[in-house]
Amino acid sequence: MLPDPSDAEDVSVYYSLTIQGENIATADDLQAYLDAKEDYVRRLMAEKYPEIGFTPFPENIAELYIEIGKKYNIRGDLAFAQAVKETGYFQFFGIVKPYQNNFCGLGATGVANTGEERMNGVDEDKAAYIPGMHGLSYTTVEYGVEAHIQHLYAYATTETLPDDCELLDPRFGYVKRGIAPLWTDLNGRWAVPGNGYGESIIEHYWFEAMTLDENIM
């Protein structure tokens, strides 16, 4: 049994965490982490990306990750931490933009969309590859979160999507199913070369949120 994060002497004990399983953090824990980080993120954007400025955090983003994750038995708290890493605290200073509601770089390969990309049965009123942009765009925050969770589900298990869950990830079928049951198994798969990718999600974002104190950043 893993120790409580506040009692853990070494974060590496969490490197064996599975993608599937129960949340350890609550939505309130994750929201408190974002709230505590806001001043730091505002400074970061002002200093490094003044032309972009601060983008408000998506509404209810922590709760959405927790609740949608439960539907798929995916650890939504870790998925949230991955989203924080991928988006730069939801500031999107890379090629994916905040209005795309794409929290994990889904479909963003570094080459701009042509608009001819396959949607593989995904409702195009909910998701699209907009020509000239990078990666998928979703019409709501909720759809974007669920697509992220589904992509993790593809890596973590060979099971079909849970009943009553609509496919939102057009890249779901491109994943070798079940190849990454652990977060650290995403190394070299989700990100290339991706050395230490899973460890970074756990250590630099999730563990920091779990050990939040008044002096954070």
Each language-model region and where it sits:
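Catalytic cores of secreted/periplasmic lytic hydrolases that degrade extracellular macromolecules
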Residues: 2-217
